[in-house]
Amino acid sequence: VTPETIARLRAQFGLDRPFHEQYLLWMHNLLHLNLGYSFAYQAPVLEIVWPRVLNSMVLVVPSTVLLFLIAAPVGVCGALRQYSLGDRVVSFLAYLGLAIPNFFLALILMYLVLQVYFRTGVMVFPVSGMTSSGFEQFSFWQKVVDVAWHAVLPIVVLTTSDIAGFSRIMRGQMLEALSQDYVRTARAKGLPERVVVYKHALRNAIIPIVANIGGILPTLISGAGLVEVVTAWPGITPLLLDAISQQDLYVVAGFLTMGLVLLMIGNLLSDLLLAWVDPRIRYE
């Protein structure tokens, strides 16, 4: 590379300016949603990253909703029936789920699906990719169904792996809440067990979980991790790994910036939810 080319690139990206001017230029571009220009893809970073974010949302949003809908009741039931057969079975499965990496679980499910296909000729769910061949010729609803069909296996993997940890946390919080004096007082007053559990114990047990909701939004950027790589899902993680291997600085920095912004938004939402869940918190 000639010195003239280096000087031109430094001027193009503002690297010849003082540090404070570079920072102000970066803030100006960030406020205008300009995350830079990709060297590898020869396109603005936002145009490259945003479609991948949407693809990851197809997996992350449903798996997060299913996580709360399944893991919370499982944790509550485990706390109410502590050391019962069902609690022991669920605890064993939870520890097993924590021990198995989600990408390895994806490989196991892919193997089982392929075995069913080889034996019966029926492909229960696609094992890779996001769309079928001829996708562009499909109608709108056919496209929706096709993407949803391809998303089933990775969503099952993500939900199963996350349920293990979340249900254990929910169970522990419920056990602690059920041992508190206010629960014994509520029972002594003759309140129905349903009211004691769901209005008093659960509402307090869920507070630490709500406080950690702020960390969920950045997962929309981090995506489904290696599950996307294993299942060839065109999400965030494959693009990030490709950008790192090609030293595409602005794409990597764009990921980090979007993750930081979503983390701040998530923390704000968790604070607002805490005020709704916990009556002791009031914002003036």
What are these regions (language model features)?
Residues L15-A72:
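An internal, D/E-rich "acidic patch" concept
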Residues R17, L24-N29, L93-G129, V157-I163:
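Membrane-water interface segments at the C-terminal ends of transmembrane alpha-helices
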Residues V1-D16, L46, W50, F68, ...:
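N-terminal signal-anchor/first transmembrane alpha helix
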Residues P18, Q22, W26, P44, ...:
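Amphipathic alpha-helical recognition patches that constitute DNA-binding helices
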Residues V53-G86, N102, M130-E284:
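Alpha-helical transmembrane segments of integral membrane proteins
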Residues T5, F19, Y23, L35, ...:
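Hydrophobic side chains within well-formed alpha-helices
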Residues E21, G36-F39, L105-A106, G121, ...:
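Short, hydrophobic secondary-structure boundary micro-motifs
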Residues V1-L24, Y117-V144:
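Hydrophobic alpha-helical transmembrane segments of membrane transport/permease proteins
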